[in-house]
Amino acid sequence: MVSSRRRDLDVLTMGRIGVDIYPLQYGVGLEDVTSFGKFLGGSPTNVAVAAARLRHSAAVVTAVGDDPFGRFCRREMARLGVYDNYVLVNSELPTPVTFCEIFPPDDFPLYFYRRPTAPDLRITPDDVPEDAVRNAQILWLSVTGLCQQPSYDAHCRALEVRGKAEHTVLDLDYRSMFWQSAAKAHEAVSAVLPHVTVAIGNREECEMAVGESDPDRAAHALLDAGVQLAVVKQGPKGTLAMTREERVEVAPTPIDVTNGLGAGDSCGGSLCHGLLEGWSLAETIQAASAAGALVATRLECSTAMPSEPELFAMMAKHPDIAIKEEHLS
């Protein structure tokens, strides 16, 4: 459990929360599944849990329904070490639920139940905790939070308050079912990118954001859009990170995949860890890649996030992972 008294936050995330209902049978469609596990979910929430597991203070600006699943989310956040001070309760909308199917190694269909909308998309600019946003060491926003009003305006308010401070992160986290079109998503992301310092996404998300799926071209395009650090996740092909001065590419960690859905959020939490600890870019991306790989070997997302000893053990188990470093200027 976490105390209600705290210093300024290390990591403050904003956006999606819900309950993940994942099958306990693999290789079986939902119509034939007979048992499920229930877990805290939502990408920004998972990132906060990942950061908390790595000994950082973390909180989420979000909202849940006034229902059993909402109470579960808040209780589970506290159990996992994440402050729930900024979790609102919406009495009109239910807490979202997400189902998935598990077909390893690379097919994990998702089914989101967030209609007509979700409480986390009803956050308004007045709900933004300005002091927390201003003072957090890392502010982590998600593209999904830009898909509807008033959440879009709330995210813009957070960025206005933040003032492009160091470690203002946009997770490209593109889910097509939440948007009218990819063009609408691109328009929203294009308006926000100049106000963040870090952008992270996979190749498909980069194509939506900047029109490039080639990792190097995507990274350059993100830098040209105004970020200072671009991270392109390539799944089984590794991870690329680039600043104006440096390019780092880390080969993938060899694993047997169970469920890849939480890998990106674990990577994000470890990216936060490296930034907060002042690690080199190569060290940070190596750890982020290893963290993502470790969670991909597990069923769930939030409760699968590694502790620092688990992360270091994973890295020690694979000491020969290729790391390419290049100084660009």
State where each predicted segment sits:
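Conserved N-terminal subdomain of the carbohydrate kinase-like
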Residues: 57-143, 168, 312-329
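Conserved beta-alpha-beta core of the PfkB/ribokinase-like small-molecule kinase fold
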Residues: 138-221, 237-239
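Short beta-strand scaffold segments in enzyme catalytic cores
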Residues: 49, 97-101, 238-241
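Conserved phosphate-binding/catalytic region of the ribokinase-like
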Residues: 1-12, 160-161, 211-329
